[in-house]
């Protein structure tokens, strides 16, 4: 029975759902509901990945439950999406390691990227020509819109 459940199907669905969330195709609580379904299926075939999905769900809830974007048609701001994805990077990496993604999931390249816009707003000494900021850009960090 265990082999008949096709665990890769559920791992792939989690990444598909996260990609749609990242791209703004789906919002909250839809992402929560989708991931909860995938987590339930993964419990039977790969408890480690099910636990990773559970952590992803909890992180997304922490940011969005009860927020102005909870159940509304308002798009979730990019800086919130970026922060969520920076927090779930280790769990997403577990899913990626379990699959051969072949570059299908473009959002993965942004998961570990620092949102320089947010950091710049927090810095009292921000200067876009500053050596530190140029070094961060050269290392692949990006300004998210």
Swiss-Prot record:
<keyword id="KW-0945">Host-virus interaction</keyword>
<dbReference type="GO" id="GO:0039657">
    <property type="term" value="P:symbiont-mediated suppression of host gene expression"/>
</dbReference>
<keyword id="KW-1190">Host gene expression shutoff by virus</keyword>
<comment type="function">
    <text>Plays a role in the inhibition of global transcription by interacting with the RNA polymerase (RNAP) clamp, locking it in a fixed position and inhibiting the formation and/or stability of the pre-initiation complex (PIC). Also overlaps with the transcription factor B binding site; overall RIP probably interferes with DNA loading onto RNAP but does not displace DNA once it is loaded. May play a role in virus particle assembly, possibly by dissociating active RNAP from the virus genome.</text>
</comment>
<keyword id="KW-1191">Eukaryotic host transcription shutoff by virus</keyword>
<dbReference type="GO" id="GO:0039653">
    <property type="term" value="P:symbiont-mediated suppression of host transcription"/>
</dbReference>
<dbReference type="InterPro" id="IPR054511">
    <property type="entry name" value="RIP_P131-like"/>
</dbReference>
<keyword id="KW-1111">Inhibition of eukaryotic host transcription initiation by virus</keyword>
<dbReference type="Pfam" id="PF22238">
    <property type="entry name" value="RIP_P131-like"/>
</dbReference>
<keyword id="KW-0946">Virion</keyword>
<dbReference type="GO" id="GO:0044423">
    <property type="term" value="C:virion component"/>
</dbReference>
<comment type="subunit">
    <text>Interacts with host RNA polymerase (RNAP) subunits Rpo1N and Rpo2.</text>
</comment>
<keyword id="KW-1262">Eukaryotic host gene expression shutoff by virus</keyword>
<feature type="region of interest" description="C-terminal tail, binds in the RNAP DNA-binding channel">
    <location>
        <begin position="110"/>
        <end position="123"/>
    </location>
</feature>
<protein>
    <recommendedName>
        <fullName>RNAP inhibitory protein</fullName>
    </recommendedName>
</protein>
<comment type="similarity">
    <text>Belongs to the viral ORF131/RIP family.</text>
</comment>
């Amino acid at each position: 029975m265990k082999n008949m459940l096709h665990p890769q199907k559920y791992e792939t669905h989690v990444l598909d759902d996260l990609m749609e969330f990242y791209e703004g195709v789906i919002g909250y609580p839809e992402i929560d509901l989708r991931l909860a379904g995938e987590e339930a299926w993964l419990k039977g075939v790969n408890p480690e990945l099910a636990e990773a999905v559970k952590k992803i769900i909890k992180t997304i809830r922490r940011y969005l439950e009860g927020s102005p974007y909870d159940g509304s048609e308002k798009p979730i701001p990019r800086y919130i999406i970026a922060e969520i994805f920076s927090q779930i990077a280790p769990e997403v990496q577990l899913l990626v390691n379990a699959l051969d993604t072949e570059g299908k999931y473009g959002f993965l390249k942004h998961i570990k990227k620092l949102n320089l816009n947010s950091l710049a707003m927090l810095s009292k000494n921000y200067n876009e020509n500053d050596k530190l900021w140029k070094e961060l850009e050269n290392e692949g960090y990006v300004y998210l819109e």
